[in-house]
UniProtKB/Swiss-Prot annotation:
It comes from Odobenus rosmarus divergens. Residues 1-141 form the Globin domain. The modification Phosphothreonine is found at T8, T108, T134, T137. One of its GO terms (biological process) is hydrogen peroxide catabolic process. The modification Phosphotyrosine is found at Y24. This is Hemoglobin subunit alpha. The modification N6-acetyllysine is found at K16.
Length: 141
């Protein structure tokens, strides 16, 4: 459960990303594909080479979904319901992949914002990404 302090840390950090959230989403997705090659199986139609426009575009979609989640941090199930349906029923993404992408998002954010990435912020973002992952996989059951 996200505490009030966690919610503040997440919102403050996300605000500091400014217009870079989409860029970071693409970088994190590319990092996921490079670090965990099995995640590529869901994207056979993509050009997965470094710097791919398709990977960047999908990374922006990920970042946009997270921006929506941050804006609706008190109602994540409601805010992410359609996305949960898509991943559970149509795409059938293995839930472990959300954890892998979450890890790569944390690494990417830490690389770009080392001063702001305090232990408390790291813990709050980790809890937030874990909560988002749980919501996205809730309809798998």
């Amino acid at each position: 459960v996200l505490s009030p302090a966690d919610k503040t840390n997440v919102k403050t950090t996300w605000d500091k990303l400014g217009g870079h959230a989409g860029e970071y989403g693409g970088e994190a997705l590319e990092r996921t594909f490079m670090s965990f090659p099995t995640t590529k199986t869901y994207f056979p139609h993509f050009d997965l080479s470094p710097g791919s426009a398709q990977v960047k575009a999908h990374g922006k979609k990920v970042a946009d979904a997270l921006t929506t989640a941050v804006a609706h941090i008190d109602d994540l199930p409601g805010a992410l319901s359609a996305l949960s349906d898509l991943h559970a029923y149509k795409l059938r993404v293995d839930p472990v992949n959300f954890k892998l992408l979450s890890h790569c998002l944390l690494v990417t954010l830490a690389c770009h914002h080392p001063a702001e990435f305090t232990p408390a912020v790291h813990a709050s973002l980790d809890k937030f990404f874990s909560t988002v992952s749980t919501v996205l996989t809730s309809k798998y059951r």
